[in-house]
């Protein structure tokens, strides 16, 4: 998975198992790589709309265009991670993403706007989620769901910095704000790559070094590492991928449009300042339930719990549609965090439990392809519906319906038999 020489289970400066440091580095990676383009995306979109006066579909459609690169590169970046290692992918991706943010700060028209966002998304796709998860999957087979929850939690924690980004936009302008974020991104790449880029020991050696044996009944003590071709032939791969893609339809829409829904007069109708506090609450709620979900996922059947959490994600969308005032928005934020936050690490951990470590990067990349396609489509479709109707209600109810379908689909994801 990674390129450095193997290290022992304990770091030289700490008695903490090194895999936890890899998970923490992955969390920091996600804070940087997802903060400006995922958690804070709608605040930047509002600033762009205010300055240029473009339609809602044009402004938010950039999220779809940016994810197009991620969709195309999903399988490739997984293969590259397995071949070259997490460290090299993080340095390359953060350099590209940071340069894209600097370019973004200088844009003057829609062509530059879309090109800059594509570069940003491309960089963070290469150096962000897939390599971080591949490293954690290699290091932490004994506590896979918990470790993955820490990494994914970093994405949620990126939302904690939304008020700071809003403050920067209001006081220094969106151009200076994105320029500084770009510099921070480039600087963050090498240290994160150094920590996460150390190669995990062989599976048998790793299991001798961990403090405790497996306590997850779904995870065998010795796993078969499925190849990508073998994984594609299983019902579990497609059930997990389809379910994950359906649930992420609403994730793409919410990340692009939440600030608009919270501040629009025909939406929740909050002030910009009040709305900026809801997004960190969403982030903290998601982060908390991601950790709880990871902890539970290492001890109970993930396949039994995930459908309930997916349904709660759908319920939160209905609550957002009905929300009037701050309390309604707050209720949405908490329930969204419970559903979205809790189910996310479990879905990813199921892949590791079912398909092993060796080819996890490319298997995750192939799964990310339909997820990225869904997240690519919904921002622009929801924006177009809003431009035509002046409301997000029909879109939110439709996305809730997709969550119901996903809750049924994941039940089909039984553990595949070991290929002969």
Model-derived segments and spans:
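Extracytoplasmic gate region of multi-pass secondary transporters
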Residues: 37-45, 229-288, 295, 378
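C-terminal ends and interior cores of transmembrane alpha-helices
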Residues: 95-108, 312-324
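Intracellular juxtamembrane helix-capping segments at the cytosolic ends
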Residues: 48, 126-140, 342-355
